[in-house]
Amino acid sequence: MRIKFLKAATTIALCGGLVAGCSGENGTADPVSSAPTSTSTEITSTPAASSSAPVAASCGSDLLASLSLRQKLAQLLNVGVTGTDDAVSIVQNEEIGGIFVGSWTDQSMLTNREVPQVASASKLPLMVTIDEEGGRVSRVADILGPDPSARETAQTMTVEQTYQMALERGRGLKDLGITVNYAPDVDVSSQPDDSVIGDRSYSDDPQTVVAYAGAYAQGMRDAGIFPVIKHFPGHGSASGDSHRGEVTTPPLQDLIASDLIPFRELSGTGVGVMMGHLEVPGLTEPGTPASISPAAVALLRDGVGYGAAPFTGPVFTDDLSGMQAITDRYDIADAVQAALVAGVDQALWLTTDDVPRVLDHLEQAVASGELPQTRVDQAVVTVAAAKGAVTC
């Protein structure tokens, strides 16, 4: 078979213009010419990243008109849940756009097939997200069995075998009710296996990362799971661990020559992108990680600065509540606001406790003009398009 990465055939692209691992748990983290040639499957569509049928809307205008400001803002939040009751409560009461299944989540929500119960509490399609890379970053190994780390995969498997492994894992995730996987990790790294990225990276060779990560993302897509590549603009050569504090990458020009190549090659293949909590000399302001940096999001969106096509898909933050690169400087409400202002479409954090307070804060930010209404509307439509909730 042959895997082909078709850049134009994505659900998200139809609404153009309009995501360290995302677990926050210390130590666990959470041009297509280089596409693999050993398998043959065409991307003819991108799976809708939600757990229920789409709602009718025309390029987002009908959807936007049907939502209050608070409902719009809630669609831009994705939070970790402890189990079914917690998930149903936050979805029903606050109408958030997504839930995150972490290592602390009661697995009975998955094994008892209770995700549809959660999704039915939502008026709009619900993103059900997970951080399932394989190796040490796996949330369902006890249910579906272990998969190898990215590095072990590239060292022991062919590209075709990687595609088949991802296809099987994706089908397993879909059967459990998952719709979005914050994987594959496309960081380019030669770090030791047990470092923050380490064996989560396929290789220190960018083209090897493109081939294997591309095959993994393709397998997820073909299984009906929406893949999210990470951690933009590249964590593989950074100093430090964003779970524990500030992280600085090599200068932007160095990233363009290596770390950004997988993003350039894969961002147009029907994926989302997760922003890393990374300070980048020559790109971000001091003290402002890429996840909340307008300049970093603009680099991704425009593409021009690193030779990529414009990116019109959904942009996610890494965890904003459990990683000290953010929490040492920002309260969760301020961090979410900063991310949305910067151009991110959906903010991720690990508990439901602060959702009402964050929504209150964001409503005030819109009222004061600090968070433009147009930015909110753009993000709502981008997220809705990724869920298949708008047709454009």
For each of these PLM feature ranges, what is it?
Residues 73-81, 97-101, 126-133, 180-184, ...:
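Hydrophobic faces of well-ordered beta-strands that scaffold small-molecule active sites
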Residues 47-85, 318:
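Boundary/entry segment of secreted carbohydrate-active catalytic domains
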Residues 81-93, 162-172, 256-262, 330-338:
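Short, acidic/polar
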Residues 1-20:
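Sec-dependent bacterial lipoprotein signal peptides
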